Amino acid sequence: MKRIFPVSLILISLLHLTGCIPNTSTQVPSTAIPEIFPDYTYVTVPSTIAPLNFTPQDTFYTAVIAEFSGTRGNLFRVKGRKNITIPKNKWTELLNANKGDSISVTLKILKEDKWIQHTSFPIYISEHPIDHGLVYRLIAP
C-alpha cells in the first residue's frame, strides 16, 4: 500500500506534464518569415537587453509557440495564446551563451487545428552590453 501512493503520484505528474505540451505533429511548413509586432526579425541587440516579447500579426489563430535556439546551445520553447512572453532567466542565459553570434527563432501558429511552422529568423547578439544611460520610449506614429 505504501508503494502505490508514490507510484500513482509519479504517474499522475507525468500525465499532467504531457497534457500541457501541445501536440505539434500535424505541422504545415511555411516559407514565409512570420510577421510579428514589434518586428525583431534580423535585428542586432545588446547582450544585456530585456526579453524581446512579441505578438504574431497573423489573424484567427488560437495558440502560438516560439522556439529559441542559439548556435552555442540553450534551446527553449515559449507558448502562449496570443503573445510570446519570454522568461527573463532563460533569455539571459541564452544571450550570455551566444554573445557575438546569433539566435534562431522559429514560430509555430495554431490555426484551424493545424500548426503552421514559419521559416526561422535570426536575432544577432552584440558582444557589448546595453549603454547604461540609454533610455527609449514608444511614440505613436
Model-derived segments and spans:
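Intrinsic low-complexity, intrinsically disordered segments enriched in polar/basic residues
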Residues: 2, 14, 138-139
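Bacterial N-terminal signal peptides
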Residues: 8-18
